[in-house]
């Protein structure tokens, strides 16, 4: 995405100092002005700033649809963003300093933390959660090359829908919310996977967008667990490999069947016909005047041509 720069550095290893080149993450401030009023300065990776700004305003509750945004302009070179909204923002805003990288800001944390979700009946198989995290890991090229970049994605049982990278984990979700706004995508009932820690500001943003499941490679905070429990969100932490820890609303996760037990004819074929319980080879049992395995082969011959 062009968010890195090459720098000459000194590398100390095994008692020796040598010069080398290293990729470093770009960090850029963005001064946000809304309706002529300077609202905040966002510190973020310098790409797709329109998504970041729109998502930030959406997650703060200032906009709901693109119709609420009359004009939005950003300038990466000068680090400014100017927005004209159809409605005025509140005159008195009480900012909350969040636990995000570089200390994020939220204006609506208390307003969203206990608002229940509408789509409570949405369920996800564990395999879909694993597949989403694997897709996220494959896309996170910057993190593998030099670290310092967070990533997040939103999707459903059909797969990944939106993906974002940023040096701030809270910014990744703002970017996703903004892109969904531009593309008119409804995120209600979707799941969010993230590389970063799940804290209260992340949950508050998820509640506002109708996200029903959040999964992270790392740990959640105690307040985020309580917020997810109250809002009806399934919260997953420490998702690594083929395991995860589920902190709230386990009823939404459908466990995968035991891959070691396949029942019926398919199980007999794949198991080689052996039966520990019967102490015999089931494929050799008589069926319609022939062996069971011969009958299976005959059926398969009728179904599939050479």
Residue ranges and their predicted role:
Residues 1-157, 162-163:
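Intrinsically disordered, low-complexity regions enriched in acidic/Ser/Thr/Pro/Gln residues
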Residues 22-25, 74-75, 142-147, 153-155, ...:
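Solvent-exposed alpha-helices and their adjacent loops that cap or buttress functional pockets
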Residues 152, 192, 265-267:
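Conserved hydrophobic helix-helix packing surfaces used for dimerization/oligomerization
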Residues 155, 247-249, 286-287:
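Short beta-strand-to-turn element immediately C-terminal to the catalytic PLP-Schiff-base lysine
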Residues 170-246, 255:
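Feature captures the catalytic cores and cofactor-binding loops of soluble hydro-lyases/lyases
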Residues 248-260:
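A charged, well-structured terminal subsegment
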Residues 261-306:
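Nucleotide and nucleotide-moiety/phosphate-recognizing core
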């Amino acid at each position: 995405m062009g968010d890195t720069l090459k720098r000459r550095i000194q590398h100390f290893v095994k008692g020796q100092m040598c010069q080398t080149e290293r990729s470093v993450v770009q960090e850029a401030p963005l001064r946000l002005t809304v309706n002529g009023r300077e609202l905040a300065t966002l510190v973020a990776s310098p790409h797709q700033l329109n998504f970041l700004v729109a998502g930030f305003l959406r997650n703060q509750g200032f906009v709901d649809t693109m119709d609420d945004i009359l004009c939005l302009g950003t300038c990466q070179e000068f680090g400014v963003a100017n927005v004209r909204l159809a409605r005025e923002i509140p005159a008195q805003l009480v900012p909350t300093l969040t636990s995000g990288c570089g200390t994020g800001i939220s204006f609506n944390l208390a307003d969203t933390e206990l608002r229940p979700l509408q789509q409570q009946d949405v369920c996800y198989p564990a395999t879909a959660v694993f597949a989403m995290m694997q897709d996220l890991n494959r896309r996170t090229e910057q993190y593998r090359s030099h670290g310092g970049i967070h990533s997040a994605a939103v999707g459903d049982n059909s797969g990944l829908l939106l993906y974002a990278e940023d040096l701030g984990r809270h910014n990744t979700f703002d970017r996703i919310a903004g892109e969904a706004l531009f593309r008119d995508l409804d995120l209600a009932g979707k799941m969010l996977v993230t590389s970063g820690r799940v804290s209260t500001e992340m949950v508050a943003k998820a509640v506002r967008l109708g996200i029903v499941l959040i999964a992270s490679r790392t740990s959640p905070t105690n307040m985020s667990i309580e917020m997810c429990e109250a809002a009806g969100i399934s919260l997953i932490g420490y998702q690594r490999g083929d395991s995860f820890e589920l902190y709230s609303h386990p009823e939404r996760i459908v466990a995968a069947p035991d891959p070691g037990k396949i029942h019926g004819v398919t199980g007999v074929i794949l198991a080689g016909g052996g039966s520990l319980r019967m102490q015999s080879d089931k494929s050799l049992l008589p069926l319609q005047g022939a062996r069971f395995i011969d009958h299976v082969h005959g059926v398969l011959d009728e179904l599939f041509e050479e």
